[in-house]
């Protein structure tokens, strides 16, 4: 089984003929051919049933480094299991905001032990966190949406951008069922914000399908999921949901329900090239 580290990868399997995606420089808009190639990969992934086979197709189609960001929630644990099972050459990293539940950190350790992986841990800049807390207070993110978004930006978005530097593909564990904003999410799209291909190999999975996969493969799962936490983020910003509530109702519960995102997955993505 290959060891996932923060170091660059060796040579990848040869891509399918005519199916290679070519990353564009980060400072330029996505040319029309890159958008078209991402759409073609999206169609190929939709025709594949197995998660493991989808991951292999991703590594065949996307040249250069492919990386997977895990929040250590149940969706990401399923993808992590499939990466290990398939031997797909995909780096793995997670964001430690400094405010995780202890159970989340326990899941990180259990996952590394189970799969023999070295999961790269990305931290926010300490000085930026100090300045944020000095300005807004330790719980200032509850006073205004702008404060909360600033906190997410420093603790999550900026470390994410550092982790994605130099990557050609970014794998996530997002599912369409998770929120209205993700209902039409593709398997693959050109990510204009980061200059790479964004890949969602379990986009079409139902919760029942996800839970069945996890049970069948004895995947390590964050115990908070069994305590009413379908979506798990930072401890001060996450609560258990009540019966009948949306699965993301426990995230930033003091805010309006519309468009509650941390900024990791709601930036501009696939765009048409300028005429």
Where are these regions (language model features)?
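Nucleotide-activated chemistry modules centered on ATP-dependent adenylation/adenylyltransferase
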Residues: 2-275
């Amino acid at each position: 089984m290959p060891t996932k580290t923060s170091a660059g990868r060796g040579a990848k399997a040869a891509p399918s003929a005519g199916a290679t995606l070519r990353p564009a420089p980060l400072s330029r808009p996505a040319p029309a051919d890159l958008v078209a190639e991402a759409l073609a990969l999206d169609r190929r992934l939709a025709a594949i049933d197995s998660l493991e086979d989808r991951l292999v197709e991703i590594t065949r189609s996307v040249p250069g480094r492919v990386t997977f960001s895990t929040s250590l929630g149940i969706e990401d644990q399923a993808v992590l299991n499939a990466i290990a099972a398939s031997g797909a050459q995909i780096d793995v990293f997670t964001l430690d905001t400094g405010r995780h539940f202890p159970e989340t950190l326990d899941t990180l350790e259990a996952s590394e032990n189970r799969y023999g992986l070295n999961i790269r841990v990305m931290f926010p800049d300490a000085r930026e966190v100090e300045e944020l807390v000095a300005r807004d207070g330790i719980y200032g993110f509850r006073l205004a949406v702008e404060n909360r978004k600033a906190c997410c930006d420093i603790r999550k978005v900026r470390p994410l951008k550092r982790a994605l530097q130099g990557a050609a593909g970014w794998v996530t564990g997002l599912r369409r069922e998770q929120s209205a904003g993700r209902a039409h999410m593709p398997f693959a799209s050109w990510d204009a914000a980061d200059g790479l291909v964004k890949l969602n190999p379990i986009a079409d999975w139902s919760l029942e399908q996800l839970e069945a996969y996890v049970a069948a493969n004895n995947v390590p799962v964050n115990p908070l999921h069994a305590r009413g936490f379908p979506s798990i983020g930072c401890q001060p910003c996450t609560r258990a949901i009540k019966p009948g509530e949306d699965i993301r109702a426990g995230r930033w519960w003091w805010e309006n329900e519309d468009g509650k995102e941390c900024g990791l997955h709601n930036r501009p993505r696939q765009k048409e090239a300028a005429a």
